[in-house]
UniProtKB/Swiss-Prot annotation:
Designated name of the protein: Phenylalanine--tRNA ligase alpha subunit
GO annotations of cellular component type: cytoplasm
Family: Belongs to the class-II aminoacyl-tRNA synthetase family. Phe-tRNA synthetase alpha subunit type 1 subfamily.
Entry-linked PROSITE patterns: AA_TRNA_LIGASE_II (PS50862)
Localization per Swiss-Prot or TrEMBL: Cytoplasm
Listed InterPro entries: aa-tRNA-synth_II, aa-tRNA-synth_II/BPL/LPL, Phe-tRNA-synth_IIc_asu, Phe-tRNA_ligase_II_N, Phe_tRNA_ligase_alpha1_bac, Phenylalanyl-tRNA_Synthase, tRNA-bd_arm
Species this protein is from: Citrifermentans bemidjiense (strain ATCC BAA-1014 / DSM 16622 / JCM 12645 / Bem)
Gene symbol of the encoding locus: pheS
EC number assigned by the record: 6.1.1.20
UniProt: Mg(2+) binding residues: E253
GO molecular function: ATP binding; magnesium ion binding; phenylalanine-tRNA ligase activity; tRNA binding
Amino acid sequence: MKDKLEALLDQALSELAQASTEEGVQELRVKYLGKKGELTSVMKGLGALTPEERPVIGQVVNTVKSKLEEAFEVRGGEIREVVKSARLSAERIDVTLPGRRRPLGSKHPITLVTEEITSIFGALGFAVAEGPEIELDFYNFEALNLPKDHPARDMQDTFYFGESVLLRTHTSPVQIRTMLKQPPPVRIIAPGTVYRCDSDATHSPMFHQVEGLMVDKGITFGDLKGILTLFISQLFGSDIGVRLRPSFFPFTEPSAEVDIACVICRGKGCRVCKETGWLEILGAGMVDPEVYRHVGYDSELYTGFAFGMGIERIAMLKYGIADMRLLFENDLRFLKQF
């Protein structure tokens, strides 16, 4: 029986060495150590041995059982290590690879243009002034020489909250508030949000403006032209053509529309500029004495100029945007281009 047990041990160890999975090891464990296993069958024959043989063979059985249990544990551990190593190799992360960058946002084209305009005028000595978007009739219209019967006061053009409270239609009220707070000299720009009852491919009920004001002794129309020409060359390039056309604004006299050579055709004429070769970008003029009267400035002593432009229009021209509504739709496919 001793030889049989040793042969059983050798056979079990040989088969165990061939096992390549934990399931295979478990099957061999059941085959040799289970209730109906090979070793159990041998142990059942111990009763047929003589009293002298029984303890000797019993010790051999225990030795074989211990060796098998140890062998099964060792082989199972080896297989688990192999499986673990294979999985780690398959799931390995190369720590030398660059990290995955988070998608970064960018500034909106309106913000970009506003900051550029502010920077250009800041270099020319203009401070930034701000005012409320909900404005009084006096600051928005009356102090700017817009009488009660002026068309801009119509409900179709202005959002009213009451008889004298409204959403500002331009940032010019900031100029009035600034002049009422301080004596000359004044040199400010007023960027901000304004509101008008209008909405199409080139207009929005809410849009952005930058208006400027300079008041001091001896300010002339030549100063206005020089500053605006320099501003335009900084914004669109020194080779861009500039012209001023006579116009009318209630709060400036004389007044002018400022055009630049079409950024698409460079003044040759195209569909965008309606074959004229020019694009209007802002309005300007010398401050009307009537405005000075409302803020308590002496129009005989001080002169000055004002100008205003729509930031959306500047952005559309600068970046070649065909439809203003793109600036308000928050489409990432569009915004990621800036």
